[in-house]
């Protein structure tokens, strides 16, 4: 079965003019990607922890500045609570409304930041918070103890543009 599938695929590649691309680029790349997956990605654990610490310090500082500007503590990660603070308590012009309240999407906050500088702190807080939770705290858990490296799966044929992507992580 595989031999007939290969023959059919080869004929299909020839008729579409991509056989050379397959033989000279795609097929050799598969072997390189397999080696890269096996080797894994080295990490500098001490540097990782230092960066994480620096960002957590900055995150706490931003939270303090946000609370000070708002005059109270609230859940900055809650769009509903943030909307109440910005648009009701502080009287900023409300843009889009959603079914759950005021929109606090990045584009809305970026517009507000032009007139209300402290909103930049909220945007920076969101960025740093996302970096910490998505990468700095999550990726070290994916380091394989036997290699001390992160091993991913490279995808050669997933993207529409032809670039290589990775998954898991």
Task: Walk through the language-model features, giving the residues of each.
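Conserved "right-hand" nucleotidyltransferase catalytic core of DNA-directed polymerases
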Residues: 1-169
């Amino acid at each position: 079965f595989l031999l007939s599938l290969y023959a059919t695929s080869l004929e299909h590649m020839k008729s579409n003019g991509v056989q050379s691309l397959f033989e000279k680029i795609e097929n050799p790349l598969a072997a390189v990607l397999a080696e890269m997956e096996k080797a894994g990605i080295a990490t500098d654990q001490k540097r990782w922890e230092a960066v994480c610490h620096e960002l957590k310090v900055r995150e706490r500082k931003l939270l303090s500045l946000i609370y000070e500007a708002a005059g109270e503590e609230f859940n900055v990660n809650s769009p509903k609570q943030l909307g109440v603070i910005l648009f009701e308590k502080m009287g900023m012009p409300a843009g889009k409304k959603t079914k759950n309240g005021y929109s606090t999407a990045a584009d809305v906050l970026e517009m507000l930041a032009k007139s209300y500088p402290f909103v930049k702190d909220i945007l920076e807080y969101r960025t740093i918070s996302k970096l910490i939770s998505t990468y700095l705290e999550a990726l070290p858990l994916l380091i394989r103890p036997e290699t001390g490296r992160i091993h991913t799966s490279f995808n050669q044929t997933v993207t529409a543009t032809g670039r290589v992507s990775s998954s898991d992580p």
